[in-house]
Amino acid sequence: IRVGDFCDYAGIQGHVEHIGLRSTRIRALDRTVTSVPNSLLAKVHITNYALRDQMLFRHTLDLRYETTTAQIGDLANAITAYLDGHPKVVRNVSLPRVRVIGFGDWSMKMEIYAYVNATELPVFLIIQQELAIAIIDLVRQSGADFAFPSQTVYLTKDALASSG
């Protein structure tokens, strides 16, 4: 790690501020500073986010069960085409990927999986917002809609209670 790198050490995420002979100072996201003995840093797993060459855009859409299979297919194709045409989205043989991945209690799950050419979080967040807004528009244009947690309760007359 180097001064300025954004890393994760034992669940603490922050920027490396100083590397000394005996300890390293990391400023966490809440602005607190943690001094860590270098002997401990040498023994634990450190994730250095500053070395990323791309950032992952992975989101799951919860679609209403009323969504038709035609709408699902059209939506998956539209999102894939949008991502394929976006200048900051990485394209290769298997990515970007848009697939139905399962069925929840109240929704069908569609996963969007793509890498974005961004190495800094503020840049990624701007691109992520742009992609998310476009995907919202594509969902609505397809005739599909987002699901929200819900339950359906069916009330019926009990056959035994009505026969007595």
Where are these regions (language model features)?
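Structured, soluble regulatory/oligomerization domains located on the cytosolic or IMS-facing side
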Residues: 9-15, 19-164
